[in-house]
UniProtKB/Swiss-Prot annotation:
The gene is U2af1l4. It comes from Mus musculus (Mouse). Residues 65-147 form the RRM domain. Induction: Up-regulated in response to T-cell activation (at protein level). Circadian alternative splicing switch accounts for rhythmic isoform expression. A circadian splicing switch produces isoform 3 in the brain cerebellum and liver (at protein level). Isoform 3 expression is regulated with the circadian rhythm but is also quickly increased upon light exposure (4-8 hours after light exposure). Expression of isoform 3 changes approximately 5-fold across a period of 24 hours, with concomitant changes in isoform 1, resulting in total U2af1l4 remaining constant. This is Splicing factor U2AF 26 kDa subunit. GO terms for molecular function: RNA binding; zinc ion binding.
Length: 220
């Protein structure tokens, strides 16, 4: 019996523990869920809840009407956000194996930033310190996440461009960063954590901020 319960833990067959929380670290039912959300006491992965704000969803004019933001502007805004958060966390807490940002619209997933550190101790320290910090005018809510394999958490239909649930899908729709930024961030090892420089010698993040003051982000 014990072996059977262990084999179905966190799966659809498990009637006690929430499979969505186990796979994704979030559940649309929240505290009202009829199944248990077993929050980990240790993990390599942390989640920063609702941290990223897509300007296409939030941009408004003074009269409250929706302000159009182009796809190019959104990608630049997102790359700046991603680089700043990744660099800041890696410099302060330790080497990051993987960082992912949800582009879903559901309240339990929108803007969630998942950061998988190489060491569990670094993740634990990050959670303890980040919950006392602010970013971009909002309090940071960080917690350890059960997610370690993002292949199990992602919507496969979305990756193939075929998800019919849209932004309210309960599996992760991960927003990609630009190819150049991916090479810059993941191409450098733990001994090279300073922000990458362009061929001009300037740090891209600083250059982008001077060019686009409206797209500045608050530091931790």
């Amino acid at each position: 019996m014990a072996e059977y319960l262990a084999s179905i833990f966190g799966t659809e067959k498990d009637k006690v523990n929430c499979s969505f929380y186990f796979k994704i670290g979030a559940c649309r039912h929240g505290d009202r869920c009829s199944r248990l959300h077993n929050k980990p006491t240790f993990s390599q992965t942390i989640v920063l809840l609702n941290l990223y704000r897509n300007p296409q969803n939030t941009a408004q004019t003074a009269d409250g009407s929706h302000c159009h933001v182009s796809d190019v502007e959104v990608q630049e805004h997102y790359d700046n956000f991603f680089e700043e958060v990744f660099t800041e966390l890696q410099e302060k807490y330790g080497e990051i194996e993987e960082m992912n940002v949800c582009d879903n619209l559901g309240d339990h997933l929108v803007g969630n930033v998942y950061v998988k550190f190489r060491r569990e101790e670094d993740a634990e320290r990050a959670v303890a310190e980040l919950n006392n910090r602010w970013f971009n005018g909002q309090a940071v809510h960080a917690e350890l996440s059960p997610v370690t394999d993002f292949r199990e958490s992602c919507c496969r239909q979305y990756e193939m461009g075929e998800c019919t649930r849209g932004g309210f899908c309960n599996f992760m729709h991960l927003r990609p960063i630009s190819r150049n930024l991916r090479r810059q961030l993941y191409g450098r090892g733990p001994r090279h954590r300073s922000p990458p420089r362009s061929h001009t010698g300037h740090r891209p993040r600083e250059r982008n901020r001077r060019r686009s003051p409206d797209h500045r982000h608050g530091r931790f």
